[in-house]
């Protein structure tokens, strides 16, 4: 049986979509192949790696990718947008995929205090983890 292919899309592919990809990999088993990408990708935020490591997830092999890497190459059954801007600007090429939108706050806007930022990143991690588990339970 072919794996269900899903794309998690945000603007930078630095935090929210990376976290979602990690949790889909952790909880979906062999039935789903998750990908993440950004409309204008940047590097993965160091606190993304840190908060996922706290939950036992190693992001080895994950890197920030452009959505252009997948256009015309991968047929996605589902496209998840995890921020409003990505939802508004999502490429129309994904019209054949079922679109799901989770409006998740960008934790990288937390400022310069690491203790405040790490808490924001943990909150976002936990919110995304909840959404992923809930969606997988419904789709099972």
Question: For the regions a protein language model found, what residue spans apply to each?
Answer:
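Conserved active-site segments centered on acidic
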Residues: 1-70
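Conserved small-residue
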Residues: 13, 52, 79-80, 128
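Residues at the C-termini of beta-strands that transition into short coil/loop
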Residues: 38, 83, 103-105
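Generic alpha-helical secondary structure signal
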Residues: 46, 65, 74, 115, ...
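Mid-chain, well-packed structural core segment of small domains
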Residues: 72-95
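Phosphate-binding/catalytic loops
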Residues: 87-140
